[in-house]
Amino acid sequence: YMRLRNIRGSKETIAASDYVVQEPETHKGTWGQLFGNEQPVQIEVGMGKGRFIMDMARLHPDRNFVGIEMYDSVLLRAVQKREQLEEDLPNLYFIRMDARNLPDVFEKGEVDKIYLNFSDPWPKKRHLTSRQFLERYDKILAPEGTVEFKTDNRPLFEFSLEEVKEAGWVLDASTFDLHHDAKLMEGNVMTEYEEKFSRAGNPIHKMIIHR
């Protein structure tokens, strides 16, 4: 897991960045205005250094993306990485926030898709795929909205499959070995971790679910 060093000045850099939405609650229900269009909004919870969501924003200019990260020191890396990009990516913003507050930031139906990539295996109640979190996602997802979850952690994946069932969500697709699943690999965008793990020969698990 990433060691979280408290980088000096990270708070100030984040507060001064045009890429970071400083008071996200004020945009609840009006994200289209911030982006300047009504394209579908997709979010990544726990985006780490931001490679996945920056690649997604570049590949899909017809969608709007919001990358959510809880830690200043990690978000700082994403901001720095983004500053070095040649292109502008007007369809991408970052937020520093705790994912437990998602329903304060997005209106019911405002989010089209939620990406969870290699989430930290917290104590069970705090897993991003626990029933408590699925309830939060349900409060912001569009009627046809989906959650996509990738991890290399098999116990976490199996726990998540159980939670999905218990919470009454529908499993659209799942695999224990994403990189050998032609259908689910279509258009797959890798995260930093994913590249490292799969290069080491570790299978990546993935599920797509909806309410």
Q: What are the language-model segments listed below?
A:
Residues 1-41, 51-58, 80-109:
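S-adenosyl-L-methionine
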Residues 45-49:
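Class I SAM-dependent methyltransferase "Motif I" SAM/SAH-binding loop
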Residues 71:
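Conserved SAM/SAH-binding beta-strand->alpha-helix loop
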Residues 76-81, 159:
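Short alpha-helix adjacent to the SAM-binding motif of class I
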Residues 129-143:
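A short glycine-rich, Lys/Arg-flanked "PGG" loop and its adjoining helix->strand segment in the class I
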Residues 144-151:
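Conserved beta-strand signature within the Rossmann-like core of class I S-adenosyl-L-methionine
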Residues 162, 166-211:
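Class I S-adenosyl-L-methionine
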